Amino acid sequence: LKKNRLPTNLVFYDDFEKPKKIKNNSVDCILGMGAFYYSKNFKKTIKNQTKKLKRNGRLIFSLRNKLFDVVTLNDYAERFLNEIYEIKKLKKNWKIKYKNLFNGFTKRKKIKLKNIDDKGVYSLFHNPLTITNELLDLGLKCEGFYFYHFHPLPPVFENFDQLYYRKISWKMENPSDWRGFLLASSFVVDCQKI
């Protein structure tokens, strides 16, 4: 910053869940890439960030895509479908039959996957079909969302040929492709304070 004759206080450290160094109604735009889905209290964090924005200010941030779970063909898919089908409400023998359907593709531990979710790091997933209303309740109007980190096949295929997998993934990257609702593991939300 000094080298380019910019004020050195433009960049500073603060708590993104409870920001204290920025005054309320003082910021035009807040960019939170790869941060907000680690918040222990997402709604409170978004409210705290929104307070810092000027009227009509923008909050742009990334979220993990809950709908991606359904196409992973692993324990993420099972978790997603358990929620949709309300498995907890089924009688015991049906729960067992249902669980047996997933025996073939939920054993992630057999393949050594390097994934932050296996390291006990807390993170949230959000549904791109419902995020607009969720943010509206928090004082933000969703202007758009944009998908990224597309997966051309279930994630386990990356272990078979990582370079090829990434090559075909890059070819798919298109933030407005409808397939992103299912094939992208993350999305960016662009909101305006209302």
Can you name each region flagged by the protein language model?
Residues L1-K2:
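Conserved SAM-binding loop
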Residues R5-K18:
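Conserved SAM-binding strand-loop segment of SAM-dependent methyltransferases
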Residues K18-N24:
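Short conserved loop adjoining the S-adenosyl-L-methionine
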Residues L31:
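A conserved beta-strand element that flanks and buttresses the S-adenosyl-L-methionine
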Residues G34-A35:
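Short catalytic micro-motifs in class I SAM-dependent methyltransferases
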Residues K43-R58:
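A short glycine-rich, Lys/Arg-flanked "PGG" loop and its adjoining helix->strand segment in the class I
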Residues R58-L101:
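Conserved class I S-adenosyl-L-methionine
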Residues K110-D137, C142-I194:
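A C-terminal cap/extension of S-adenosyl-L-methionine-dependent methyltransferases
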